[in-house]
C-alpha cells in the first residue's frame, strides 16, 4: 500500500521572500513562483506535491488590510478540498496580524495553514528564505494516520513553529524575527523536526470549514500608562461610530 502524498498549496501574498535581486541593476524584482521548483531544487526532496498561486498584485505587508485577509481566506476556502495543507508567504511586518486574523476566520479548520516569510530575498547569498520556505512546506505536509499533524494557523520562522495568534515580531535585523511570549513553540527544526504533540490543536469536529469574512473596523486600541492625559481618553471615546476599545 502506498502512502498518501500530501498536496500543498503555496499562496504568495507579497513580501521580501518573493523578491530576487536583479544583478544588472541591483534592484529587487518579484520572483516568478512558477519557477519555484527550478530555483529551489531541494523542494523535490519533500514527500509532497506543491502548487502555487499568487496575488495578482503582491502586497507590501505594511499596507495589509481586511480585504487582503478576506482574499487569503477565500483562496483557502476555494481550495480546501483539493489540498492537504497551505503555506502563506507574507511580509514579516504584519505577518502576526494576518496569522491571528485567519486563525479566527477559519472555523473548524482541520488542515495546516502555515505563514512564513524571510528577512532577506530568496536570491540573496545569505538568505533565510530557503530554510523558512522548505521547512514550512515540510511542516504543512506532515501526516499521521492519513490526517495532517498540524490542524491550525501557525507561523514558522527561523527554525521555530508558533501558534499564529500568539506571535509578535521583535526584530527587523535578525533572522529570529518572531517570538511567542506567552505560549511555547509548537515545533522546532534542527537536525530533526520535533513537534510538541501535547500543544498542537487537534480538530475533534466533523463539521465543514466555515469561513468568517465579516469585520468591523470601528474599534480602537488604547495603550494605558501611568499619567495618561484625560483629554486623550475623552477624544478616543468621542470617535464617531466607535463600537469598542481594546485596552492594553
What annotation goes with each model-predicted range?
Residues 88-111:
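Short Gly/Thr/Asp-enriched flexible loops that form oxyanion-binding sites at enzyme active sites
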Residues 1-4, 105-108, 114, 143-149, ...:
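Solvent-exposed alpha-helices and their adjacent loops that cap or buttress functional pockets
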Residues 115-190:
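Internal gly/pro-rich beta-alpha loop/helix module
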Residues 19-20, 94-99, 129-133:
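Short glycine/serine/threonine-rich phosphate/pyrophosphate-binding segments
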Residues 1-78:
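ATP/NTP phosphate-donor binding region
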Residues 4-5, 11, 15, 21, ...:
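Accessory alpha-helical/coil subdomains and C-terminal extensions
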Residues 11-13, 88-90, 114-117, 151-158, ...:
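Short beta-strand segments
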Residues 83-95, 240-248:
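Short acidic, glycine-rich surface-loop motifs adjacent to enzyme active sites
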Amino acid at each position: 500500500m502506498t502512502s498518501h502524498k500530501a498536496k500543498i498549496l503555496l499562496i504568495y501574498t507579497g513580501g521580501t521572500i518573493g523578491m530576487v535581486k536583479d544583478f544588472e541593476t541591483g534592484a529587487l524584482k518579484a520572483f516568478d513562483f512558477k519557477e519555484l521548483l527550478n530555483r529551489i531544487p531541494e523542494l523535490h526532496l519533500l514527500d509532497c506535491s506543491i502548487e502555487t498561486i499568487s496575488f495578482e498584485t503582491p502586497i507590501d505587508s505594511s499596507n495589509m488590510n481586511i480585504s487582503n485577509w478576506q482574499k487569503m481566506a477565500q483562496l483557502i476556502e476555494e481550495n480546501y478540498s483539493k489540498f492537504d495543507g497551505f503555506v502563506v508567504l507574507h511580509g514579516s511586518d504584519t505577518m502576526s496580524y494576518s496569522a491571528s486574523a485567519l486563525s479566527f476566520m477559519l472555523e473548524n479548520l482541520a488542515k495546516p495553514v502555515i505563514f512564513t516569510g524571510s528577512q532577506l530575498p530568496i536570491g540573496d547569498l545569505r538568505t533565510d528564505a530557503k530554510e523558512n520556505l522548505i521547512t514550512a512546506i515540510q511542516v504543512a505536509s506532515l501526516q499521521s494516520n492519513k490526517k495532517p499533524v498540524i490542524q491550525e494557523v501557525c507561523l514558522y520562522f527561523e527554525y521555530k513553529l508558533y501558534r499564529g495568534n500568539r506571535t509578535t515580531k521583535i526584530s527587523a535585523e535578525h533572522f529570529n524575527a518572531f517570538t511567542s511570549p506567552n505560549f511555547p513553540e509548537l515545533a522546532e527544526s534542527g537536525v530533526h523536526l520535533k513537534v510538541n504533540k501535547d500543544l498542537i490543536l487537534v480538530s475533534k469536529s466533523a463539521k465543514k470549514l466555515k469561513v468568517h469574512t465579516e469585520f468591523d473596523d470601528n474599534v480602537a486600541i488604547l495603550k494605558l500608562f501611568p499619567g495618561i492625559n484625560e483629554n486623550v481618553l475623552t477624544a478616543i471615546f468621542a470617535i464617531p461610530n466607535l463600537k469598542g476599545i481594546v485596552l492594553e
